Amino acid sequence: MCYSANGNTFLIVDNTQKRIPEEKKPDFVRENVGDLDGVIFVELVDGKYFMDYYNRDGSMAAFCGNGARAFSQYLIDRGWIKEKEFTFLSRAGEIKVIVDDSIWVRMPGVSEKKEMKVDGYEGYFVVVGVPHFVMEVKGIDELDVEKLGRDLRYKTGANVDFYEVLPDRLKVRTYERGVERETKACGTGVTSVFVVYRDKTGAKEVKIQVPGGTLFLKEENGEIFLRGDVKRCSEE
């Protein structure tokens, strides 16, 4: 079944019966991902739902923020979860979800943040489940994200996020590692940007414009929550 979280697209596969063994997952992903950004396997571990995320190239990732929102919506749509607050497991730890008029996902904590300079480009290396290189820019709409993002991605070993500060919001574009292209949205990417912006300005919530729409982030009691649009894009 296909889900889109602000244009970040995923194939979600019910693997609670272990029909697809671990060693077969990379091949399954490459053969079935099509033009989507990634594949999420729904697993059961000690009676709890586990989100097993793979990038479109078949590589495993510890976490995916928009994937977590899509995963949560999938569990709700299947009728497996009915509570307004619940948790599920991921390789980045236990993830908390709050459901009101939309889905808020508690993002993994920041395990690393440091200044980094690469080929004259200054930014921050931030890890929120997965690594990101975050850089502030001007004229983000004219930026060649495919070229510069690809160059920085291989030199930093991280996803690459460019952001511009606008009067009422931030604008973000991300080149994703493992997808190897710019995506319409990246949950851990906008979270990494929020962390950098928060530490610079003290902001506790922010609206972020991405190519796939608008995402919202807020910090409460030291925890960062993400929400945005999620919709089903196929019944398959």
From Swiss-Prot:
Thermal activity characteristics from the UniProt entry: Optimum temperature is 90 degrees Celsius.
Matching InterPro entries: DAP_epimerase_AS, DAP_epimerase_DapF
GO cellular component, one term: cytosol
Pathway: Amino-acid biosynthesis; L-lysine biosynthesis via DAP pathway; DL-2,6-diaminopimelate from LL-2,6-diaminopimelate: step 1/1
EC number: 5.1.1.7
Residues bound to substrate: 8, 55, 65-66, 159, 176-177, 187-188
Positions bearing the site annotation: Could be important to modulate the pK values of the two catalytic cysteine residues: 132, 176
GO molecular function, one term: diaminopimelate epimerase activity
Domain of life: Bacteria
Cell compartments where the protein resides: Cytoplasm
Active-site residues, as the UniProt record annotates them: 64 (proton donor), 186 (proton acceptor)
Activity dependence on pH, as recorded: Optimum pH is 7.5-8.0.
Keyword field: Amino-acid biosynthesis, Cytoplasm, Isomerase, Lysine biosynthesis
Reaction equations catalysed: (2S,6S)-2,6-diaminopimelate = meso-2,6-diaminopimelate
Any one GO biological process: lysine biosynthetic process via diaminopimelate
Task performed by this protein: Catalyzes the stereoinversion of LL-2,6-diaminopimelate (L,L-DAP) to meso-diaminopimelate (meso-DAP), a precursor of L-lysine and an essential component of the bacterial peptidoglycan. Also catalyzes the racemization of certain amino acids, including Lys, with low efficiency.
PANTHER family according to UniProt: DIAMINOPIMELATE EPIMERASE (PTHR31689:SF0), DIAMINOPIMELATE EPIMERASE, CHLOROPLASTIC (PTHR31689)
Family affiliation: Belongs to the diaminopimelate epimerase family.
Subunit structure, as described in the record: Probably forms homotrimers.
Name of the protein this chain belongs to: Diaminopimelate epimerase
Organism: Thermotoga maritima (strain ATCC 43589 / DSM 3109 / JCM 10099 / NBRC 100826 / MSB8)
Lineage of the organism: Bacteria, Thermotogati, Thermotogota, Thermotogae, Thermotogales
